[in-house]
Amino acid sequence: MQAMVARERRVVLARRVITRCSDAVGEDFDGVTAAEFQSLKEAGEFALSWEAHGLHYAIPMAVNTHLQAGRDVLANLSRTTLIHAKDRFARFEVINLTAERGVLAARLAARGRETAQQIAGRLDRATAHLPEGIEPLHLDNSGPLGQTVQAALDRLYPVKA
């Protein structure tokens, strides 16, 4: 996702709010406690929120500022919230990144955030179907990152003749 943002000026990355310790490796996010998350949610600070993997996740309302400025917002969402996102945002595209099971297992293990059992659960869920009504761009991310990024950008921003 960061590679797409680096290559395309029209794209910004949504910074998620997660009930995870802020010093966890991986994505850049705002870590909050469950109580803080609930307070923010009740105050209307989230455009979207959901639960997955034993955590609470949200996309802050700040995404509206980017959308109103004509930028596209790239966000890492759960399958469980895609229909809500489609209903919430006028223009909504889903990029469904997949990778070979061995490649995905190695990437998840390298993050160091989950146990082997949790990784196995993620691998099993990786093949789950998307909700009805979602028509994604399917991309295999098993190979070079640059190739995947270019394929996504070509689909999102086709060259007009």
Residue spans of the language-model regions?
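Conserved nucleotide-binding/hydrolysis micro-motifs of P-loop NTPases
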Residues: 18-22, 80-81, 98-104, 144-145
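Short glycine-/polar-rich loops that comprise or flank the Walker A/P-loop
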Residues: 9-11, 88-93, 132-135
